[in-house]
């Protein structure tokens, strides 16, 4: 453990930031899994409801990724890569460009 007051504060700050970052990353991963699952369900049995569900999860995932970038959890290129991969999956399943 650090003895210097400023070092102790930095340790506390780093831990707080680590937990915040972990929360955002976990939420992005969860939404990504739900989005991919919805896309797979649409691919297996195409319907308007299934497509709307996939679009809903895609939008929610995009939003969470963008918020993580805004808060410095992800680099903007990492976020762009994640979003592009999701859009590619969506386009392959639906034949539409993700909005």
Curated annotation (Swiss-Prot):
One BP annotation, GO: translation
Any one GO molecular function term: small ribosomal subunit rRNA binding
Superkingdom of the source species: Bacteria
Keywords on record: Ribonucleoprotein, Ribosomal protein, RNA-binding, rRNA-binding
One CC-aspect GO term: small ribosomal subunit
Gene3D superfamilies tied to this protein: Ribosomal protein S20
Endpoints of the signal sequence: none
Pfam families linked to this entry: Ribosomal_S20p (PF01649)
SUPFAM superfamilies assigned: Ribosomal protein S20 (SSF46992)
Function summary: Binds directly to 16S ribosomal RNA.
PANTHER family registered for this protein in UniProt: 30S RIBOSOMAL PROTEIN S20, SMALL RIBOSOMAL SUBUNIT PROTEIN BS20C
Annotated family: Belongs to the bacterial ribosomal protein bS20 family.
Name the record gives this protein: Small ribosomal subunit protein bS20
């Amino acid at each position: 453990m650090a003895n210097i007051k400023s070092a102790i504060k930095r340790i506390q700050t780093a831990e707080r930031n680590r937990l915040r970052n972990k929360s955002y990353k976990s939420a992005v991963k969860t939404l990504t899994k739900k989005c991919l699952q919805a896309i797979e369900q649409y691919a297996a049995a195409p319907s308007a409801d299934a497509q709307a569900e996939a679009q809903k999860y895609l939008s929610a995932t995009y939003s969470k990724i963008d918020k993580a970038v805004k808060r410095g959890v992800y680099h903007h290129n990492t976020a762009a890569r994640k979003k592009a991969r999701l859009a590619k999956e969506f386009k392959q399943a639906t034949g539409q460009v993700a909005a």
